[in-house]
Amino acid sequence: MSNLAQFDSDFYQSNFTIDNQEQSGNDSNAYGNLYGSRKQQAGEQPQPASFVPSEMLMSSGYAGQFFQPASNSDYYSQSPYIDSFDEEPPLLEELGIHFDHIWQKTLTVLNPMKPVDGSIMNETDLTGPILFCVALGATLLLAGKVQFGYVYGMSAIGCLVIHALLNLMSSSGVSYGCVASVLGYCLLPMVILSGCAMFFSLQGIFGIMSSLVIIGWCSLSASKIFIAALHMEGQQLLVAYPCAILYGLFALLTIF
């Protein structure tokens, strides 16, 4: 038993005493007081304000409503996009549609005895010819004749043939758009004839004579414009002959 007691005393031997325990307790209390004082000082210090740019501080205060942002008139007045938008041409002018030019060419066709200014065909205009082709098909439809396909088909083939003939006959070449523009504008008298077919039949002496007059009117106007635009003096009859054949086909559609 004495050996066992000696073993226990040797096994549990330590340098720890009651004085050391009291000293460690005092150290922990001092550390707690120091931590609490630092926490209290940190709580008493004011929090740093959020960062605000100098531009926002210098700008004027907002006076509008929440969902209605204040407009900056200086930005819109100095914006280059507003000025460029105001300087843009109208939409019809960008598309190449000029009603004064259309009216001038229409008057030239309606008065074949008037001298023709060749410069009117320097600008290729297809707005008037398309309108007259649609008007011819519409008047034939109102007269009980559905001939839209024939009108468009003969117009395209006739323009190709006369374009080839004029390039062979003239020293200066001519564009396909110019030929289509002239032939389309000169289709206006044929539209008048098809409009008359809506009210009375043209299958008679009066209808045949009226058709001959309209064919001569269309071919004379077209040949005069081609001669003036291409400087083909002395060749008007040679140009008027294929034009008369083309407009004769349109007259046959109108009568029958």
UniProtKB/Swiss-Prot annotation:
This protein's UniProt keywords: Endoplasmic reticulum, Golgi apparatus, Membrane, Transmembrane, Transmembrane helix
Cytoplasmic side: 1-125, 169-172, 218-235
UniProt xrefs under InterPro entries: Yip1/4-like, Yip1_dom
Location in the cell: Endoplasmic reticulum membrane; Golgi apparatus, cis-Golgi network membrane; Golgi apparatus, trans-Golgi network membrane
Record field: transmembrane: 126-146, 148-168, 173-193, 197-217, 236-256
Recorded GO CC terms: cis-Golgi network; endoplasmic reticulum membrane; endoplasmic reticulum-Golgi intermediate compartment; trans-Golgi network
Protein name: Protein YIPF7
Family per record: Belongs to the YIP1 family.
Organism per entry: Homo sapiens
Segments on the Extracellular face: 147, 194-196
GO biological process, one term: vesicle fusion with Golgi apparatus
Endoplasmic reticulum keyword on record: yes
Membrane topology, from the record: Multi-pass membrane protein
Keyword check for rRNA-binding: no
Region annotation (Disordered) ranges: 18-48
Compositionally biased spans, kind Polar residues: 18-31, 38-48
